[in-house]
């Protein structure tokens, strides 16, 4: 059974251990924040000017029909371009640009139709996969907040299939499996959806390191088309690409932690794939966001206007969606100069965020956010800056249906023709 930690004052060994893990994790991150504050700012000020893309403040750099326009055979723009608000304004192709062929990693049958249908729905426009980290489980819920998938279930636990501090979890290309980084267990695992088998695909469970077979606090494992996956080795200060248990590419130098990409990276907590084979990286110290091309060259680097950048996500028009892992936390859309184009972040009240770790764009133009330490996932309408959908009870961790405990990862799954989750249609970013 999964330990019930509904009561924050629970004195059981499992609850004490969970709280101790949270304290250790926050202490480690606080140490990194202090290190950032003590660093000499002059070098950072010079580095921020290294590279800047020629695009203007989030607007499109090329006309529709060019490489970066909102066209594509499988995901062509509808006759009337519908604005996705700040997430996908008409100027960059509207909502259709969110799933246009040049804005997704890989081409999968059914994606355009599934996402176009979802773009017309208010609220949660499909299914949401949630990495319920504090409860060591993965959930998939529908718009009515009903659980349609859970791993592990009782049979999985009886068979010895269990998760340990599973962090970010994403659907793999093709929809046959899920990939998850077990951050505090120092490994990456794969869950097969058909037979519910569980496999360690990199790292040694419970052993931290940063060499050819070990990772130290892995974050954001993404499976790429072709069988290679990328993961941020957070405190190894590198981003690695792994295939068949072997590192086949690496950005950053193992255990050399400083900002000089791509040769050196500081503590890394984001490594989002870009459509053309590059990677969008967030470094904790200095609040850096970097993009490295598929050939390994630095495209740009800027200081994000946040205290702790987390998991940057590419948007149409050269813009970036970013979470600020702080309390109160924020969600921003920035351009490649680091200028904020949109920001959400109430300082108090029910809309306040407490250490949001990931923000993702939905096909309907809303933004869904992991609100880690308020134990919920919220959907925000960026046109009104209001929460329009929520899973989890605010400030109340738990294991019962409707409850979460430090949700730290998620993925959007559109509905298929039969109304169920269409894992095969999922694309990233």
Language model features with spans:
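Terminal targeting segments of Actinobacterial cell-envelope proteins
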Residues: 1-34
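Hydrophobic/aromatic hotspots within intrinsically disordered, low-complexity regions
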Residues: 2-5, 22, 63, 81-82, ...
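Intrinsically disordered, low-complexity serine/threonine-rich segments
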Residues: 14-18, 42, 64, 69, ...
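Hydrophobic multi-pass inner-membrane translocation pores used for secretion
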Residues: 46-48
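Histidine-/acidic-rich catalytic cores in large beta-rich domains
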Residues: 69, 78-429
């Amino acid at each position: 059974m999964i330990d019930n930690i509904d009561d924050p004052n629970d004195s059981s060994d499992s609850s004490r251990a969970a709280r101790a893990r949270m304290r250790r994790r926050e202490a480690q991150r606080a140490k990194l924040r202090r290190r950032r504050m003590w660093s000499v700012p002059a070098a950072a000020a010079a580095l921020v000017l290294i590279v800047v893309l020629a695009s203007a403040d989030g607007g499109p750099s090329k006309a529709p029909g060019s490489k970066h326009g909102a066209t594509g055979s499988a995901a062509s723009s509808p006759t009337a371009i519908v604005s996705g608000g700040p997430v996908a304004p008409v100027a960059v192709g509207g909502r259709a640009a969110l799933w246009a062929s040049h804005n997704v990693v890989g081409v999968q049958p059914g994606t355009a139709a599934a996402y176009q249908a979802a773009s017309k729905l208010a609220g949660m426009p499909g299914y949401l996969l949630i990495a319920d980290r504090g409860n060591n489980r993965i959930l998939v819920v529908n718009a009515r907040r009903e659980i349609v998938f859970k791993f592990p279930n009782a049979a999985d636990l009886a068979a010895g299939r269990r998760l340990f501090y599973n962090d970010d979890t994403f659907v793999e290309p093709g929809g046959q499996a899920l990939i998850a980084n077990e951050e505090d267990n120092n490994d990456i695992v794969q869950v097969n959806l058909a037979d519910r088998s569980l496999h360690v695909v990199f790292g040694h469970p419970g052993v931290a390191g940063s060499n050819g077979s070990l990772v130290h606090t892995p974050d954001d494992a993404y499976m790429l088309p072709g069988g290679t996956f990328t993961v941020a080795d957070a405190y190894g200060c590198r981003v690695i690409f792994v295939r068949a248990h072997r590192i086949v590419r690496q950005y950053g130098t193992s255990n050399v932690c400083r900002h000089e990409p791509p040769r050196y990276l500081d503590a890394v907590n984001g490594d989002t794939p870009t459509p053309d084979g590059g990677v969008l990286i967030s470094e904790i110290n200095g609040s850096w966001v970097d993009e490295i091309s598929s050939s390994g060259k630095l495209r740009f680097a800027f200081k994000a206007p946040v205290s702790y950048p987390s998991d940057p996500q590419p948007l149409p028009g050269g813009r970036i969606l970013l979470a600020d892992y702080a309390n109160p936390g924020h969600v921003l859309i920035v351009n490649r100069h680091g200028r904020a184009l949109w920001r959400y972040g109430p300082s108090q009240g029910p809309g306040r965020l407490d250490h949001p770790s990931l923000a993702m764009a939905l096909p309907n133009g809303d933004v869904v956010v992991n609100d880690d330490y308020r134990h919920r996932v919220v959907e925000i309408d960026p046109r009104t800056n209001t929460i329009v959908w929520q899973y989890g009870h605010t400030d109340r961790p738990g294991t019962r249906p409707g409850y979460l405990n430090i949700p730290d990862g998620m993925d959007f799954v559109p509905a298929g023709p039969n109304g169920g989750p269409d894992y095969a249609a999922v694309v990233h970013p």
